[in-house]
Amino acid sequence: MTVELMMSSYSGGGGGGDGFPAIAAAAKMEDTALREAASAGIHGVEEFLKLIGQSQQPTEKSQTEITAVTDVAVNSFKKVISLLGRSRTGHARFRRAPASTQTPFKQTPVVEEEVEVEEKKPETSSVLTKQKTEQYHGGGSAFRVYCPTPIHRRPPLSHNNNNNQNQTKNGSSSSSPPMLANGAPSTINFAPSPPVSATNSFMSSHRCDTDSTHMSSGFEFTNPSQLSGSRGKPPLSSASLKRRCNSSPSSRCHCSKKRKSRVKRVIRVPAVSSKMADIPSDEFSWRKYGQKPIKGSPHPRGYYKCSSVRGCPARKHVERALDDAMMLIVTYEGDHNHALVLETTTMNHDKTL
């Protein structure tokens, strides 16, 4: 069945006609050879499958037979492929139609731009731009080609070398700056700055003076009091800008900081009762202002402040001991300054009178 389908598809396209007996005979011979080769190939495949199914334990004899049958089947199919690949001979030939001169769509213009940039001296630096455009010749195009404006590199700002030399020698510029309406000079000069490296930061190279401010970024402000006076604010002093510790900029500032010196004194006293509100009394009066739970203890910690004299900074906190619930740990913080508070109160009272 497979061979008949192959042969019908092969012979249907270009078989012989009644007017050409020689061509028809040649085509018939090719069909016969193709049919025989295809039948031999299919028969070889059937034999190959049969041998593989029979030989459960392959031996040398069975291997030889399988190899021979495989070679026959492969050669038969190669012959079929070669017969099918031959150029067909006969009256059925194809002719190429003449190429159509009209294109079904318009071609968009192709734009090729070649830009060459040459850097020369700062005084004569320029950009050379070359553009090559190929447009479609048939009719005008509805699309406009966008050509960007060439970018010209401008030379750096030129400076007066004589003024720079006079500034280095005399310490001040010889040229008088322009005057404002109030008569105070105020100029801003832009100068090229050296490249800033990773070790030389902007903050480390900043220098602030009362008369002028110079920064490594190339800006020079003359008489900053006039600039800051426009906003109604006084100029910043140099002392306010030098409060930062400059000993080690990479690490933390290790300058001495003032902290509240609190003297703590811890004592253990027996509890008066099992209630937390009952604390042993001493020579001062105390008022509770809060409590805080303690991790690992069922009893909270109470915080008290001295209420003997108003404004006394003395504090204490009371908590029960972990080893003995009938013992209290009292921690005192701060000193009593009742005399100082009384003197201040008396002075204020006298002033009011």
Curated annotation (Swiss-Prot):
- Could you tell me which residues form the DNA-binding region? 275-341
Sorted alphabetically, which InterPro entries does this protein's record hold?
A: WRKY_dom, WRKY_dom_sf, WRKY_plant, Zn-cluster-dom
State where it is primarily located: nucleus
User: Which keywords annotate this record?
Assistant: DNA-binding, Nucleus, Transcription, Transcription regulation
Polar residues biased stretches: 184-204, 213-229
* Keyword Transmembrane on entry: no
User: Its induction, per UniProt?
Assistant: By salicylic acid and strongly during leaf senescence.
Q: Where is this region: Disordered?
A: 117-259
- The biased composition feature labelled Low complexity covers 158-176
What name has this protein been given in UniProt? Answer: Probable WRKY transcription factor 7
**Any single GO CC term annotated in Swiss-Prot or TrEMBL for this entry:** nucleus
Family that this chain belongs to: Belongs to the WRKY group II-d family.
Tissue expression from the record: In young, mature and senescent leaves.
Task: Provide the protein's localization.
Answer: Nucleus
Molecular function (GO) terms for this protein are: calmodulin binding; DNA-binding transcription factor activity; transcription cis-regulatory region binding
Function, please? Transcription factor. Interacts specifically with the W box (5'-(T)TGAC[CT]-3'), a frequently occurring elicitor-responsive cis-acting element.
Coiled coil location:
none
Organism, as annotated = Arabidopsis thaliana (Mouse-ear cress)
